[in-house]
Amino acid sequence: MSFDFIKDRDKKVHFIGIGGISMSGLAAVLLNSGYKVSGSDFKESEILKKLRLSGADIYIGHSEKNIKDVDLVVYTAAIPENNPELIYAKENNIDLMNRAEFLGNIMKGHKYNVAISGAHGKTTCTSMLSNITLKANLDPTILVGGELDIIGGNFRIGSSDYFITEACEYKRSFLSFFPYVGVILNIDADHLDYYKDIDEITETFGQFADLIPNDGYLIGYIGDSRVKEILSKAKCNTLSYGFENADVTARNITFNEKGCASFDVYKHNDKLFDLTLSNPGEHNILNALSSICVSLIFDVNYDDIICGLSECKGAHKRFEYKGEVNGVTVIDDYAHHPVEIKATLNTSKKIPHNKTFCVFQPHTYTRTKTLFDEFTDAFFDADEVVLMDIYAAREKDTGLVSSNDLGVALRAKGVKCTNVHSHDEALEYLKNSAKPNDLLLTVGAGDVVIVGEKYLNQGK
């Protein structure tokens, strides 16, 4: 079916899994546009409370009773086929649309759609580009997979033709989009519960590039060989970025005491400007370059680019400073893939401190199993790893892999690693181990952040 964002405002739309960061953003867009919205999720959250206050009917738990008076049901790729609401909608011919198709239909109403894809960095790049376009008064609509202070959440309703969103490759979701500008930050082995291998993933990114019209643009990181190949085959305009041999490059790079980079931005051999980022880490130089490329396509003033990037605080859970207690600094990061973990720990090295305690919570059994060897090589920059049980998310424990297995493998490679089985057990270990001027990182896409929050609240 199709959905017309302008003409279908008399419809009531129900979201299965409305508490998710992307689904809640879509629901909020509809609520702000006058739609009747309902949704269900398996547990209460701050996101659900906000949606209630905005007028949504929220149900805790999934039941066919929740959708008896709705016109359209939207669901995510993570919703299982045996979900009672999904079954009822199919049996009773209620219109169904997955999240990606629904977002794609909303995008149809905009001319300058920017879809930011890649295994890592999507939210940060979207955050940077959001800052720039807001500084430039482009008045974009924004949907992002994280909370941004500058827009007060994970969405913004604009009144222009500019639409900025993340584009996830999971279950080929981004193939439902209509990009005018497509960004490929990187390609990596992930979501192997769905894809056969990295070659199939790369093929899907190539299909994403093919969605861009001939007068549109594909932007990609030249240092990733798979992205480089897709750029070379693109039928649309292309713009590459990287540290060398790219259209847009960063040169003369230095880092300050907070781990934030200063560098000169060049297009070919012409220096455009210099800037200092407020987001730490070498990987954020690349994220910044990707957002600069988009900005150049839209002829954004250099001063707005510089201001947008220098003031960008990034999204929550992206190397997010949470606080300090007893001289121990606590930082939370969403990293859940070995490449991301390495980047996070590398960033931490640029900040003056004594020991780094990395509290890591593996995310899904499939990812832990398929990338097991890569995980065992991801923690060498941590002084100590506190390893929590695997966060199941959408999966069930098959008994094929556990955090204990990962702990054994890490210790065999010389990593100091302690397995814990609850937030409180992790907290007690850290209270007895962390000392003034140490750095405590909570790392993962589950609920590991609770450990850091409890650590900061000790004694209160």
UniProtKB/Swiss-Prot annotation:
Similarity field: Belongs to the MurCDEF family.
Enzyme class: ligase
Pathway: Cell wall biogenesis; peptidoglycan biosynthesis
Residue ranges crossing the lipid bilayer per the database entry: none
Reactions this protein catalyses: UDP-N-acetyl-alpha-D-muramate + L-alanine + ATP = UDP-N-acetyl-alpha-D-muramoyl-L-alanine + ADP + phosphate + H(+)
Main location: cytoplasm
Localization annotation: Cytoplasm
Entry keyword Cytoplasm: yes
Source species, domain of life: Bacteria
Binding site for ATP: 118-124
GO CC terms of this entry: cytoplasm
Enzyme Commission (EC) number: 6.3.2.8
GO BP of this protein: cell division; cell wall organization; peptidoglycan biosynthetic process; regulation of cell shape
GO molecular function terms listed in the Swiss-Prot or TrEMBL record: ATP binding; UDP-N-acetylmuramate-L-alanine ligase activity
PANTHER family given in the database record: UDP-N-ACETYLMURAMATE--L-ALANINE LIGASE, UDP-N-ACETYLMURAMATE--L-ALANINE LIGASE-RELATED
Record InterPro entries: Mur-like_cat_sf, Mur_ligase_C, Mur_ligase_C_dom_sf, Mur_ligase_cen, Mur_ligase_N, MurCDEF_pg_biosynth, UDP-N-AcMur_Ala_ligase_MurC
Function recorded in the entry: Cell wall formation.
Name of the gene this protein is made from: murC
Name of the protein in its database record: UDP-N-acetylmuramate--L-alanine ligase
Keywords noted in UniProt: ATP-binding, Cell cycle, Cell division, Cell shape, Cell wall biogenesis/degradation, Cytoplasm, Ligase, Nucleotide-binding, Peptidoglycan synthesis
